[in-house]
Amino acid sequence: MANAAQKKLAAQNKHILTFMLAADLIVNVLFWILRFFVRSGLSKFSKFVYAFASISSGFLHYQLHRAAAPKYDARGSLLYVGQDLLQEGVTSYMVDYMYFSWILIFLAALTSVKVFAFYLLVPIFVVYKAAPLLKMLLQQLKNFKNQALNQPPQQQQQQQQQQHQQHATPSEPVLSKRQQKLRKKAAKYSRP
């Protein structure tokens, strides 16, 4: 069977996208039924927050559908597999955000719209995930600065270490690593 892996990925993506569409519809319909027919109505702010949650989740579903939906020709043969929805990275974060939105919408339908305050966790999560990237970016900027000064980072660190050693022990001569190793070996064998 030719392209079995691609066909398997296409079927997997189609299944996941169908599940996402069904879950999105069910959660939103349940919200409307529970909030307007079973419980009291919503304030303007609550409607705004619900609209934000629903529209952002729907937008991400649309983007994932565009990127991952398999495309077939008229005969039914696979033309485009689509992006893997189970891969790590931005796709994973988009799916997680959709699940998070659905959970909050469902909980807001059951309890109170104050549950939407948990959306404040999203920027905290973004900062948590972006901190290592920011640290790496700052290190790269530092390396670029060193390159602009025509000093590689290792050479600059060695110079700083040598200056530190010279200031720390001015009376003792600075020994190379090889000399230090030879002295340790000599001291080891000279002891009876």
UniProtKB/Swiss-Prot annotation:
Ranges annotated as biased composition (Low complexity): 151-167
Record flagged with keyword Transmembrane helix: yes
Broad class of where this protein is predominantly found: endoplasmic reticulum
Record key words, sorted: Endoplasmic reticulum, Meiosis, Membrane, Transmembrane, Transmembrane helix
Subcellular localization: Endoplasmic reticulum membrane
GO biological processes: meiotic cell cycle; protein insertion into ER membrane; protein targeting to ER; vacuolar protein processing
Endpoints of the signal sequence: none
GO terms under cellular component: endoplasmic reticulum; endoplasmic reticulum membrane; intracellular membrane-bounded organelle; vacuole
Annotated region described as Disordered, given as residue ranges: 149-192
Topology of this chain in the membrane: Multi-pass membrane protein
Top-level taxon: Eukaryota
Keyword hit for Transmembrane: yes
Alphabetical list of Pfam families matching this protein: TMEM208_SND2 (PF05620)
Membrane spanning stretches: 16-36, 102-122
Chain's role: May function in a SRP (signal recognition particle) and GET (guided entry of tail-anchored proteins) independent pathway for targeting a broad range of substrate proteins to the endoplasmic reticulum. Has a role in meiosis.
Protein family according to the UniProt entry: Belongs to the TMEM208 family.
Protein name: SRP-independent targeting protein 2 homolog
Species annotation: Schizosaccharomyces pombe (strain 972 / ATCC 24843) (Fission yeast)
